[in-house]
């Protein structure tokens, strides 16, 4: 009955999705493209940008160059640089309050997933002042025009610069605010901003992008020709460039390719959705503070294996794009999963998450099921018991 209800919901949502106003940000890409933010502000008559960025980014030479350009144009910045990993409801409220106090007119977000999530959630809160942040959680709860968002990713992973989602942590529980109005108007993909990333962060965020692409590609009802093409492009690019970026952090070509792959994967899952990996990963981040990319890197091969034959045809196709061989769909699909594991190992990504406590697994399974069902159009609908089995496998690494 649960599976029937989920599939019925997904079919209806897929029909309705064709009538939603999907859009993609206008993109500026290439080394030094951060300075295009000044042009964007000037062309749109925006004079008081609210910057959300880490202290490290604010001290970076590229940001200082942008700041000097904006000073020459008498554009006054308000800066918030206190976003924690996994932004909290309290941080979102602080950003919204300071934005109002400083009478800002847009957001300029420079950073990884946490600053992006915090700024987008604050934008939702500003658009809906009568609602609390938790009340905005879920799908299409905002439905108002938000302040203009200019997104500048410094990691190649979340794809938040093109997605509808902002993930917030409330206590030990993570949830997403998802609405089309949260898709940024502009995305700036400047590879010079990501050359200083540590190898571990490069690996984990890159595997997050791969998870986005694969989950979008496996989507049963929400997929379109465009999302399939974007997901395929992202998968091929990630396998070609992620390990090279991991080994040589200064390679602008590989950093640029990964930023584009992350953007493509984000655009794919914005329309086609994520899946059960993300449902579990959010519980790991909320309960234990496990970095989102690390959680997805560990979960991706485990869940793909658990899907079994339901995922073989599409995984086999992805394997073919990578030049992996096999006589049957099953052997090609398993070769693709094996290649994910091999890439994880080459980048020193662990194969288990031993922070998971046995007594927490039922709660994690319940949270994951509540997030995934009925919305996520996964190859196999999981109930709480099946989520619990996969979480146990993630704990043991088998």
Regions found by a protein language model. Name each.
Residues 6, 315, 325-398:
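C-terminal charged capping/lid subdomain of soluble metabolic enzymes
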Residues 31-32, 54-55, 83, 110-112, ...:
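Fold-independent oxyanion-binding glycine-rich loops
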Residues 272-341:
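C-terminal catalytic subdomain
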Residues 90-97, 101-192:
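Glycine/threonine-rich beta-strand-loop-alpha-helix active-site module
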Residues 1-106:
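ATP/NTP phosphate-donor binding region
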Residues 34-37, 59-62, 89-92, 114-119, ...:
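Short glycine/serine/threonine-rich phosphate/pyrophosphate-binding segments
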Residues 165-272:
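Carboxylate- and glycine-rich phosphate/diphosphate-binding segment that chelates Mg2+/Mn2+
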């Amino acid at each position: 009955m649960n599976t029937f209800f989920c599939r019925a919901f997904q079919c209806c949502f897929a029909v309705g999705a064709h009538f939603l106003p999907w859009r993609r940000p206008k993109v500026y890409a290439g080394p030094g493209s951060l300075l295009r933010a000044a042009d964007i502000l000037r062309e749109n008559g925006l004079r008081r940008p609210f910057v959300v960025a880490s202290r490290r980014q604010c001290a970076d030479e590229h940001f200082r160059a942008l700041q000097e350009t904006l000073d020459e144009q008498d554009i006054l910045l308000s800066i918030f640089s206190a976003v924690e990993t996994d932004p909290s409801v309290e941080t979102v409220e602080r950003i919204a309050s300071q934005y109002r106090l400083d009478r800002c007119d847009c957001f300029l977000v420079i950073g990884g997933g946490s600053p992006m999530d915090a700024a987008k959630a604050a934008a939702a809160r500003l658009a809906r002042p009568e609602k609390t942040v938790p009340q905005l959680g879920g799908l299409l709860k905002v439905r108002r025009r938000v302040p203009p968002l200019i997104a500048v990713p410094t990691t190649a992973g979340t794809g938040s610069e093109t997605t509808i989602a902002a993930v917030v942590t409330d206590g030990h529980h993570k949830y997403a605010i998802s609405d089309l109005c949260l898709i940024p108007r502009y995305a700036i993909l400047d590879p010079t901003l990501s050359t200083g990333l540590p190898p571990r962060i490069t690996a984990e965020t890159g595997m997050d992008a791969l998870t986005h692409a694969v989950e979008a590609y496996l989507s049963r009802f929400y997929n379109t020709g465009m999302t399939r093409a974007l997901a395929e492009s992202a998968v091929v690019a990630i396998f070609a460039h992620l390990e090279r970026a991991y080994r040589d952090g200064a390679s602008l070509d590989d950093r640029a390719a990964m930023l584009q792959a992350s953007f493509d994967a984000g655009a794919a899952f914005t329309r086609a959705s994520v899946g059960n990996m993300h449902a579990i990963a959010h519980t790991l981040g909320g309960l234990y503070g496990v970095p989102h990319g690390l959680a997805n890197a560990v979960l991706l091969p485990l869940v793909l294996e658990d899907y079994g034959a339901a995922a073989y045809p599409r995984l086999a196709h992805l394997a073919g794009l990578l030049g992996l061989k096999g006589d049957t769909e099953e052997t090609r699909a398993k070769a693709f999963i094996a290649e994910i594991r091999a890439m994880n190992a080459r980048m020193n990504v662990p194969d288990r998450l031993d922070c998971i406590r046995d007594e927490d697994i039922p709660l994690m399974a319940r949270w994951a099921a509540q997030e995934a069902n009925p919305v996520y159009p996964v190859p196999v609908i999981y109930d709480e018991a099946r989520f619990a089995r996969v979480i146990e496998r993630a704990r043991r690494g088998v």
